[in-house]
From Swiss-Prot:
Cofactor detail note: Binds 1 Mg(2+) ion per subunit.
Family: Belongs to the succinate/malate CoA ligase beta subunit family.
Keywords (A to Z) from UniProt: ATP-binding, Ligase, Magnesium, Metal-binding, Nucleotide-binding, Tricarboxylic acid cycle
Source organism of the structure: Pseudomonas paraeruginosa (strain DSM 24068 / PA7)
Residues reported to bind Mg(2+): N199, D213
Needed cofactors: Mg(2+)
One GO CC annotation: cytosol
UniProt cross-references to InterPro entries, sorted A to Z: ATP-grasp (IPR011761), ATP-grasp_succ-CoA_synth-type (IPR013650), ATP_grasp_subdomain_1 (IPR013815), Succ-CoA_synthase_bsu_CS (IPR017866), SUCC_ACL_C (IPR005811), Succ_CoA_ligase-like_bsu (IPR005809), Succinyl-CoA_synth-like (IPR016102)
Protein name per the record: Succinate--CoA ligase [ADP-forming] subunit beta
GO BP of this protein: succinyl-CoA metabolic process; tricarboxylic acid cycle
Keyword Cytoplasm: no
Assembly: Heterotetramer of two alpha and two beta subunits.
Coiled-coil spans in chain: none
Chain positions recorded as ATP binding sites: K46, G53, R54, G55, E99, T102, E107
């Protein structure tokens, strides 16, 4: 689950980290009022969406009057912002962050992720702030500095000082950076985060450090023990199909192809997508119905897949272990009848009662193509999607 920038900065402030004075507003009038509350003669206004690249898309602007702040809010509130990280529809803007202006001397980067190989929280810092850190890591990996956090003792001040020295910070800046580093590490652990970024972490003209941005991603598996963060969830930023799938405990990720995939098991689902690609097809989604694939869940899975107008054929690949293939076959038949599937459906069943499942499908009288193997299934569904 992602947080908006203004929500991330609220958490930063709770941990005593330096952030700009600002207000999240949802009307143009409140945007003008926020300028009065903040004071000064210049403000930064930012459209709040769960996507990067807002500045280039016109979603971030420096304004010099309350009227300009109000006009910016009128321009974006209730509209969709399209950036390089969104699809063609963009994401809806329901909040505008109005902030005080910051005099920037230099931009740094500071972030943290859970490193799966070391099973530790790893902090990354760089002098290349304000740009895409993935590009920095690819082009100039030597510019990425790292500090691994021991889960037994947590982040240590000496690690912050070491990073600060390597970043070229001096004097009181080292103390400030260490405070930010330790605070972010505590926040990361306290709130079960999966990713945290301050990009950029800036050195102001007066020499002080300042968190100019906040990107936070929470481990969704830990939300049950983070009620405060659950309450911050903005469902308007979620893909509608993915939100529907979550309600039915289906693992769904929308993609850009035209072949819908329904599979039980994440590994088998990835393998299915690979073999579809191998035979010239493009998957429209990743969908794992899990081990408890009931008729109801299969029906909802079909609804989700077919809500994508790009889908020209559906491949159902089930390995029957705990779940019997004949029961899955009945679920598929019921779902096809209920949903009114108009595109070709290719089904490959293997494992527990696979032959009986194939027989049930054959006797259904529906336009369901039974495949004899995974390769056959991939070839059949690619042909079907091409109208052959």
């Amino acid at each position: 689950m992602n947080l908006h920038e203004y929500q991330g900065k609220q958490l930063f402030a709770e941990y005593g980290l330096p952030v700009s004075k600002g207000f999240a507003v949802d009307t143009p009038e409140e945007a003008a009022e926020a300028c009065d509350k903040i004071g000064g003669g210049e403000w930064v206004v930012k459209a709040q969406v769960h996507a990067g690249g807002r500045g280039k898309a016109g979603g971030v602007k420096l304004v010099k009057s309350k009227e300009d702040a109000k006009a910016f809010a009128q321009q974006w509130l209730g509209k969709n912002l399209v950036t390089y990280q969104t699809d063609a529809n963009g994401q809806p803007v329901s909040k505008i962050l109005v902030e005080s202006c910051t005099d920037i001397d230099k931009e740094l980067y500071l972030g943290a992720v859970v490193d799966r190989s070391s099973r530790r929280i790893v902090f990354m810092a760089s002098t290349e702030g304000g740009v895409d850190i993935e590009k920095v890591a690819h082009d100039t990996p030597e510019k990425i500095l790292k500090a691994t956090i021991d889960p037994l003792v947590g982040a240590q001040p000496y690690q912050g000082r070491e990073l600060a020295f390597q970043l070229g910070l001096k004097g009181d800046q080292i103390k400030q950076f260490t405070h930010i580093f330790v605070g972010l590490a505590k926040l990361f652990q306290d709130y079960d985060l999966a990713l945290l970024e301050v990009n950029p972490l800036v050195i102001k003209k007066d020499g002080n450090l300042h968190c100019l941005d906040a990107k936070i991603n929470i481990d969704s598996n830990a939300l049950y023990r983070q009620p405060k963060l659950r309450a911050m969830h903005d469902p308007s930023q979620d893909d509608a199909r993915e939100a529907h799938a979550q309600k039915w405990e289906l693992n769904y990720v929308a993609l850009e192809g035209n072949i819908g995939c329904m599979v039980n098991g994440a590994g088998l689902a990835m393998g299915t997508m690979d073999i579809v690609n191998l035979h010239g097809g493009k998957p429209a989604n990743f969908l794992d119905v899990g081990g408890g694939a009931t008729k109801e869940r299969v029906t909802e899975a079909f609804k989700i897949i077919l809500s994508d107008s790009n889908v020209k054929a559906v491949l159902v690949n089930i390995f029957g272990g705990i779940v019997r293939c004949d029961m899955i076959a009945e679920g598929i038949i019921g779902a096809v009848k209920e949903v009114g599937v108009k595109v070709p459906v290719v089904v490959r069943l293997e494992g527990n009662n696979a032959e009986l499942g194939a027989k049930v499908l054959a006797e259904s009288g529906l336009n369901i193509i039974a495949a004899t193997s995974l390769t056959d299934a991939a070839q059949q569904v690619v042909k079907a999607a091409e109208g052959k």
